[in-house]
């Protein structure tokens, strides 16, 4: 399963299930808690880039001056309402943001994106994460913030994911609509910080009773997945 194959499956799945996904993140308690954390992090930001937006705003758009919503699939996402007045859509891949102005944004946010950047192997998937973070750092102004909201797992579960990744990804690809994912421990995401960026904040977002797993509401206590906010500051 190549990165290109994963991108296509992500497009098909999230385009088809956009309305249901919006409803779930709007009503499930885990994402209500997540929204409060995001709102606090973006409040007062002048220029915000939301990379991997997918047509879903998991925060109050009024808290930022202007928002550039970036996604590879924006042209294929049906829109049931007009965008907020301060939002500009841009079609681009997080793995290649060459068409996006460099050193332009005060903050860049990625919400539940990194675990979807899977490749043929677990190693290729982590390379995609590194590339995505580097691309996002390039469009940040000096002293800008890279805000990552991500589903993480304990190290023991990550080792399990690595051991079964290729057969599990093949089975998922053949059997369900949702694309395969690879979740990382918090320490691994901190480890792959882009050059010139320093960790400013790591905040655990308390799980509620329900959390999405492969697009399906799932009891929070039955999964090791843990939402977290990680903020990098561009220092160079």
PLM segments and residue spans:
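Conserved alpha-helix/loop element of class I SAM-dependent methyltransferases that forms part
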Residues: 27-45
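A short glycine-rich, Lys/Arg-flanked "PGG" loop and its adjoining helix->strand segment in the class I
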Residues: 126-142
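A short SAM/SAH-binding and catalytic strip from SAM-dependent methyltransferases
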Residues: 107-127
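Class I SAM-dependent methyltransferase SAM/SAH-binding core
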Residues: 49-97
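N-terminal, positively charged/glycine-rich alpha-helical extensions of SAM-dependent methyltransferases
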Residues: 1-19
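Core SAM-dependent methyltransferase catalytic element
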Residues: 196-197, 214-236
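A short acidic, Gly/Pro-enriched loop at the edge of an enzyme's catalytic core
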Residues: 95-108
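C-terminal alpha-helical "lid/dimerization" subdomain adjacent to the S-adenosyl-L-methionine
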Residues: 148-196, 200-212
């Amino acid at each position: 399963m190549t990165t290109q194959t994963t991108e296509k499956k992500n497009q098909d799945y999230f385009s088809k299930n956009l309305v249901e996904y919006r409803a779930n993140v709007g009503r499930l308690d885990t994402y209500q808690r997540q929204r409060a954390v995001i709102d606090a992090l973006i409040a007062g930001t002048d220029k915000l880039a939301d990379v991997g937006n997918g047509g879903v705003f998991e925060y109050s758009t009024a808290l930022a001056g202007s928002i550039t919503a970036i996604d590879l699939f924006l042209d294929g996402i049906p829109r049931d309402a007009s965008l907020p007045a301060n939002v500009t859509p841009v079609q681009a891949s997080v793995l290649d943001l060459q068409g996006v102005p460099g050193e332009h944004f005060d903050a860049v946010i990625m919400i539940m994106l990194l675990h979807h950047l899977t490749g043929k192997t677990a190693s290729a998937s982590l390379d995609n994460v590194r590339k995505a973070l580097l691309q996002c750092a390039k469009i940040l102004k000096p002293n800008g913030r890279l805000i990552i909201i991500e589903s993480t797992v304990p190290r023991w579960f990550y080792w399990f994911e690595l051991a079964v990744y290729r057969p599990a990804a093949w089975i998922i690809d053949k059997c369900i609509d949702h694309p395969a994912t690879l979740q990382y421990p918090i320490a691994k995401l901190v480890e792959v910080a882009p050059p010139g960026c320093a960790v400013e904040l790591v905040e655990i977002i308390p799980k509620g009773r329900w959390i999405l797993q492969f697009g399906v509401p799932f009891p929070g206590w039955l999964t090791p997945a843990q939402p977290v906010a990680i903020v990098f500051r561009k220092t160079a």
